[in-house]
Structure formats: structure tokens, C-alpha cells
Amino acid sequence: MKLKNILILILCIVLCPPIVMAVSDNTVYTEFTGGNSSSTGNGTEQSPYNLFEDALNAVEDGGTICVGEKGAFVNSSDDKPLVINKNVTITSKSDTAPEISIRKAGVVLGGNVSFKNVVLSLVNGNHA
């Protein structure tokens, strides 16, 4: 009986950590490839979201958004700011500091947001 319990415990230790790591990895990728279409990408490293807003909508609270070398883009014709209401880290995928270009009326941080190795740029003079 003891041997059976020990074997079950060893199997649980060996098999469970990969499952836990897969569930807890909440990283979403974005890289602007052109156009205003969000139809490209699914948020993985191999197929990042084209638009930053899609990555922001997909990332869970406490997660990370990785920005590719080509940067990220937020485009809008309205006069509302970009609102980030999640606890999220926004970081570069590599050692470069890609630019996150924002064409909105500013940025409102409603959550605990950390920017690491990225350049945040407000690029449209038409917004107040």
C-alpha cells in the first residue's frame, strides 16, 4: 500500500508542474504589421495581434503584453483616451525598445500598469 501511494505521489509531482505552468502563463503578443485590421494574429508569439487593443482585450488581469520589434499601434477617430483597467505588464519581446504609437486622446491607467523597455508615443495632434 505504501509503495502504491509513493508511486502515485511521484507521478503527481512529475506530471503536474507542466500543467500548472501552462495555465499560469498569461502572455499575449502584439506587433503592428500594417493597416487597421485586427484580423491577423491570435496573440501567440508566432502569430501576434496586429493591433494593441486586441492584445489588451485578450490579456487577463495580472498578465503580460509583449510588443514585437515593429512596435504596436492604437488607432481611433474618437476623442476618448485609451483606458487600461487591468493589472498588466507591457514589455518588449526583445532587447529593443519598440514604440507603442497611440492615436487617441491620451492614456488613462486604471490598473497597476508597468511599462518595461517600450516607448509610449502620443502621435495625433487632432485630439484634445
Question: Where in this protein do the model-derived segments appear?
Answer:
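Positively charged n-region of N-terminal signal peptides that target proteins for export
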Residues: 1-5
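Bacterial N-terminal signal peptides
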Residues: 8-18
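Right-handed parallel beta-helix/beta-solenoid
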Residues: 19-54, 71-72
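Acidic glycine-/aspartate-rich tracts in secreted/extracellular proteins
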Residues: 33-40, 62-63, 69-74, 94-97, ...
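Predominantly extracellular beta-rich ligand-binding scaffolds that present long acidic/polar faces
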Residues: 79-80, 85
